Amino acid sequence: MRIVIFILGILLTSCFAGNEIESGSSKIKISMLVDGVLDDKSFNSSANRALLRLEEDFPENIEKVFSSAASGVYSSYVSDLDNLKMNGSDLIWLVGYMLTDASLSVSLENPKISYGIIDPVYSDDVQIPKNLIGVVFRIEQGAFLAGYIAAKKSVSGKIGFIGGVKGDIVDAFRYGYEAGAKYADKGIEIVSEYSNSFSDVNIGRAIANKMYAKGIDIIHFAAGLAGIGVIEAAKELGDGYYVIGADQDQSHLAPRNFITSVIKNVGDALYLVTSEYLKNNNTWEGGKIIQMGLRDGVVGLSNANKFEYIKVIERKIVNEEIIVPYNHEGYEIFIKQILKL
């Protein structure tokens, strides 16, 4: 369940003006730990590019940047974060919801280090430390647009969704997508499965081939490297088999098969928050979550201009005329109350 959220515009005017963490120092070291692999052609790649861009744009502020990757267990995350601390890091970014628990423990243990985390999943009763800022995305809003397009474009009337490991973030993709599809066409058939992996390309390909064999002609995925297998399956099958990507524009991997990608501009968000920190004498007031969505320009679709008809739907979401569900409970309410199904 989501905790109380602070809107981006309000936060950026206040969160850097309070308690100082190592304020006024000269050049600093910024580090990042991602869950999985750095070059995942998606989520982590976007964050890593942002870190390198910060180093280029703020040479007078940044001494050095570090990037590291880990996967699997809590102890591994904490060990890697400790290594980044020992490297002299002043600001450490954690990328991926699997690092949620680690973000709390390391920030509490190291109050003089500033921490940021992308896509944390905290329970309602968690008190976020003052040196920790979380960034979450209303990714269900972008997925809703993708589902709407998929339902309109499908020839067979059957579309699919493949998620990685089931959890709040992946479910937001799924239920936003399903809600958008049903909003466009109440009769659309939707099949959703989970690969239980963010790294197994072969399982992604196998699930996609099974779906395509059953007449599904469009698959949206949010599965990390397993999603590469979905792309490969569509590419091998050729025309008439389509995919919708996740996190960043992946259309170059299969131009003839891509409809669009649900964009989560992880890099832009990381860059924005970090640049504000640098511009404000390295002052970092945490204890808050920043929520970003369509309104902030960090969630949306690649090649959005290709789908002019979707702009009406986008405006309704931004104006809260459509409240997009991000979990199963919200989806059931959406279906019953909004669509009367």
Swiss-Prot record:
Pfam families recorded: Bmp
Residues of the signal peptide: 1-14
Domain of life where this protein originates: Bacteria
Lipid addition sites, S-diacylglycerol cysteine: C15
Localisation: Cell inner membrane
Gene3D superfamilies: 3.40.50.2300
Classification via PANTHER family: ABC TRANSPORTER GUANOSINE-BINDING PROTEIN NUPN, TRANSCRIPTIONAL ACTIVATOR PROTEIN MED
Subunit structure, interactors included: Monomer.
Entry function: May be part of an ABC-type nucleoside uptake system involved in the purine salvage pathway.
Name recorded for this polypeptide: Basic membrane protein B
Annotated source species: Borrelia garinii subsp. bavariensis (strain ATCC BAA-2496 / DSM 23469 / PBi)
